[in-house]
Amino acid sequence: KDEFADDFGVVFMQGACGDITQVDNTAAADVVMSGPAVGRKIGLSVAGETVKLLTQMRFHESAPLAASRKLIHLKPRQPTDEQLAWAREHVASDEPTPSWWSNEGFWSRSWIELDEHNKIEPEVPCELQAISIGRTAYASNPGEFFCALGNDIKRRSPFDNTFIAELANGCIGYVPTEDAYEGGYESSMCLSSKMEPGNGEIIVDETVKLLETMTVPADAPV
């Protein structure tokens, strides 16, 4: 707004970044990687690049608009009977550990919470949306979507440019690629990582189908 005009509209959409973090896990312990100062640094970096791009843009008086949506239902992960038995045995554990990651009490509570939540919501509603402006499309989903899944949508989209907007119209937790379930932070089973393996690929397929129902105008600006 300072650079262009007070009535200049800014829309921020979070791309597919479920497996991206600003945290450098190899850095020294005293390196600050979160908080207002880090947020401002990242924000100014993005804003600076955006201003550079805007000065090079060609603007058009009009462009055709279209929108479509679809509601799908996904299967959540379910702790096994053995995992739940272990969880109930260790849920009261307050044994000190180096981090929450290795805390038995944390994981016990997480698995019990997930099991109870699944009884209330045996299927997870997932709203997908697609909006096109000319030959450019925006596709949204409510997950913390892994980069590779977003890139797959872009590669298969019929539009010249396709942008992903994650955590839109809800939050269904992390949505990893199928091979990411071999291990790691984002795919460790809990209420914030409740997607069954393969759900990410289902979202990709359904999003591409949604985009394919929309007409790409031949003579519209990109």
What are these regions (language model features)?
Residues 1-222:
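Non-catalytic substrate/cofactor recognition surfaces at enzyme active-site rims
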